[in-house]
Amino acid sequence: MGTFNVSLKTLTDRVSMEVVYTPKELDQICVEIAEVNRPGLFLAGYYDYFDKLRLQIMGLAEMNFLSGLSPEKRYEALDQLFRQQPPAVIVCRSEELTPFPEMQELAQKHGVALLRSNETTCTLMGSLISVLNLELAPRITRHGVLVEVYGEGILILGDSGIGKSELAIELVKRGHRLVADDAVE
């Protein structure tokens, strides 16, 4: 069992997001952990416990906080965030919130993808976490046959040629379902 990652291309295909800026092709930028982060405390200057491997979600609270800062303080706060080089910074509610111009400038400067979504922060976070949990879930591939018998999954394992597939065929004839044969992930 190895570690898995998911590309930003997969995420933008499956979750409602569009690209504002990307330093390279979306399929070359990978996310390795299933957690996301709202960087409100980080933007306010509290830098402890910040995980730069997480996607950074900018919602209404973060954007309103930044709009209340002077241009110099806003640039400084955003520079601190983009300097961490997270996989991407995503601005939610893009119909009412537009990324600050300095966000695109800093994304280019630090090589960080900048995305936006029309979804609310909670909806986007739920969708992202769901896709990330599915794509990054630990898994192994086993040689065998997977069948569903009376609603329960049963994995039939054994040496090659002992009749695993024949057993599965008999179960299917009796109304049960074949899920996978040969290589089961």
What residue spans do the PLM features occupy?
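Gly/Thr-rich phosphate-binding loop signature of adenosyl cofactor/nucleotide-binding cores
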Residues: 1-82
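Fold-independent oxyanion-binding glycine-rich loops
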Residues: 59-61, 93-94, 118, 150-152, ...
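P-loop NTPase nucleotide-binding/switch module
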Residues: 131-151
